[in-house]
């Protein structure tokens, strides 16, 4: 039996996935996707990431969990999208394996959109994710852009978890305690291995305060941005190649524990893009959604995150300021 970790196995899964997805692309182009789905119902498409999940081609009547009618699903997707787009059902996400194919840990429907785009609909939470912008990219990405996947414990962390990161994970539901831990450990940095983007090779997460920025001219702008942050939450770090290289994104946690990346390229505060549901998921998925490469769709239309969003955190004062007097008299709980 071939080792699942070998390059040949990875290439084989990619080639098979791409072949099946190309058939889907042709069916969409010919406006015959419904016929394709009827003929291929039961076909499983396995991706390289994660290996434990697959796409099962299925008609609506054979989805193994309760859904809505086709018209109701289309209406739901239209509400979730920031612009009108025709979506056609492909099937659902399931666990890989013949014996567990009908086990759906997350009730997720997969749709084919216009211009080769693919979407995942979290049916329970009514949240729509853009999985990929092209057929080839979907074969490469798999479900990397789908939040619930990162709640599974079999998804490895992208950096070594030490006592500080573990304490932050334990405090991710308490922004006050989380910010205090960041304050105490400001200046620490962690290399996060990138399993997806190859432009920079690695990304570095810093637990950084404005006071800890290097005294270099390139950092003056970033200091000004940090000082005037209008976002409701706590800036917990920044991302870049090295400690001396000016950062391209601030990382922020809001009151709900969600992690956002705030673009700092250009002449002002840029896009605010949701990166992860919580800090632990962020350490597993990295910044696959950063740098204007991802759209996040939320059920509340007023908080849609897109390439040029109306950030839901504007016009609200920061929860913690640089001058806040943290109580450092007692040690953190274990």
UniProtKB/Swiss-Prot annotation:
Query: What does this chain do?
Result: Isoform 3 can transactivate the human immunodeficiency virus type 1 promoter.
Keyword vocabulary terms for this entry: Activator, Transcription, Transcription regulation
Similarity comment: Belongs to the herpesviridae US22 family.
Q: Which InterPro entries match?
A: US22-like
Q: Name the source's superkingdom.
A: Viruses
Identification of the protein by name: Protein U17/U16
Name the lineage.
Viruses, Duplodnaviria, Heunggongvirae, Peploviricota, Herviviricetes
Post-translational modification, as annotated: Isoform 1 is not glycosylated.
Organism in which the protein naturally occurs: Human herpesvirus 6A (strain GS) (HHV-6 variant A)
